[in-house]
Design a protein with these regions (language model features):
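Conserved micro-motifs of the catalytic ATP-binding
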Residues: 7-13, 51-54
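Conserved catalytic submotifs in the C-terminal HATPase_c
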Residues: 15-16, 35, 40-50
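Short beta-strand/loop element within the Bergerat-fold HATPase_c
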Residues: 77-89
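A conserved beta-strand-to-alpha-helix junction within the catalytic ATP-binding
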Residues: 13-28
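Short helix-loop "hinge" at the ATP-lid/N-box region of the Bergerat-fold HATPase_c
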Residues: 70-71
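Short helix N-cap motif at coil->helix boundaries in the Bergerat
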Residues: 19, 101-112
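Conserved glycine-rich
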Residues: 39, 143-144
């Protein structure tokens, strides 16, 4: 829950994280769904050997929540792309789907607790409208932000942005 996410703020850990390993391990949670729905999944890390110091549990939870939403709101057989980029002490992890997209009037509300867009209430998506709120709360705890760009009827991209302090790439 969101309260659990807030309570975890006091226990931020610093782990050595290879970004390719983070993406692969998070996506492994969806392996059955990927195969069942015949998804075309692309993972990319730039540069390939990128490594940071950060809270693995929080980064993993954020990524799992974003990927989970991408699966919920896009059809079987569609493409899902996850790209992690480390450049100039800035980490960005983007999750792009070919789903239904988000109407402009819903964009400002999607990170609110318990908010679900009207079309998702009528779909068999499950969930309670907490995933994006939790992801954003965890991103804030790490000093970052989650942004969204969406074209209604075409798809969405959710991006975690973290400024990493110093030369050690810390998150």
């Amino acid at each position: 829950t969101l309260n659990t996410a807030r309570n975890q703020a006091e226990t931020t850990s610093k782990d050595s994280i290879f970004l390719d390993q983070l993406l692969i391990e998070c996506m492994s949670e969806f392996q059955f769904l990927i195969e069942q729905e015949e998804r075309d999944v692309h993972l990319q890390v730039i540069p390939e050997s990128a490594r940071i110091e950060g809270d693995y549990a929080k980064l993993s939870r954020i990524l799992v929540n974003l990927v989970n939403n991408a699966f919920k709101y896009s059809a079987p057989g569609t493409k899902l792309e996850v790209v992690a980029k480390l450049e100039n002490n800035q980490l960005s992890i983007s999750v792009t789907d070919e789903g239904q997209g988000i109407a402009p009037e819903d964009l400002e509300n999607i990170f609110k607790r318990l908010y679900r867009v009207e079309t998702s209430r009528n779909m068999k998506t499950g969930g309670h409208g907490l995933g994006l709120a939790i992801a954003r709360e965890l991103a804030h705890q790490l000093g970052g932000e989650i942004t969204v760009s969406s074209q209604y009827g075409i798809g969405s991209t959710f991006t975690l942005l973290l400024n990493l302090s110093g030369n050690e790439n810390k998150a």
